A protein has these predicted regions:
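Class I S-adenosyl-L-methionine-dependent methyltransferase catalytic core
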Residues: 1-137
Length: 137
C-alpha cells in the first residue's frame, strides 16, 4: 500500500461499529463512496444482506475486485467528488481520504446525496476544521 493512494483498509471492528451506528436494515439503499477493498461493504452485507448497495471506487483494479466479490452491489468506477448520482440514499457509510481536508469535502459531498431523514456515518479527524465545518450537521 502506497501512502499517495490513501487506501487504508478499515479494520473489521471499525466497519462493524460504523454499520451499527448507521442502524441499517434490509429496506435501506446504502452508499459506500470510497469502497476500497470492500471492508465496509462486507460489514453491511453481514448485517443487512438484502439492502440495496451502491459503491464508488476510483481505482479500476479495486473496482474489478469489488464487482467480482460483492454480487448485487452496483460498483461505479470514478472519483466520488465528481460522480453524478441519480438518486438519494437512506444510509451513507464511509471512511473517506483524510489528507488536506479531504475528509471534510467528502463528507459534505455525501450529505448532498442523503435522503431527508437519512443517516450518514463517517470516520473523520476530530480537528478544529472538522468541528467548524461538520458540527452544524
Amino acid at each position: 500500500m502506497r501512502a499517495e493512494s490513501q487506501l487504508f483498509v478499515s479494520p473489521a471492528p471499525i466497519c462493524d461499529r460504523l454499520v451499527t451506528l448507521a442502524e441499517i436494515s434490509n429496506r435501506d439503499h446504502i452508499l459506500e463512496p470510497s469502497a476500497g477493498t470492500g471492508a465496509i461493504l462486507r460489514a453491511i452485507r453481514d448485517t443487512a444482506p438484502e439492502a440495496m448497495c451502491d459503491a464508488v471506487e476510483i481505482n479500476s483494479g479495486l473496482v474489478r475486485y469489488l464487482r467480482e466479490n460483492f454480487n448485487g452491489v452496483r460498483v461505479q468506477c470514478g472519483d466520488f467528488m465528481e460522480w453524478q448520482s441519480v438518486q438519494y440514499y437512506s444510509r451513507i457509510i464511509m471512511n473517506p481520504p483524510f489528507s488536506h481536508g479531504q475528509d471534510i469535502r467528502h463528507i459534505l459531498r455525501a450529505f448532498s446525496l442523503l435522503r431527508p431523514g437519512g443517516v450518514l456515518v463517517a470516520v473523520c479527524l476530530n480537528g478544529p476544521r472538522q468541528q467548524e465545518k461538520l458540527l452544524p450537521f
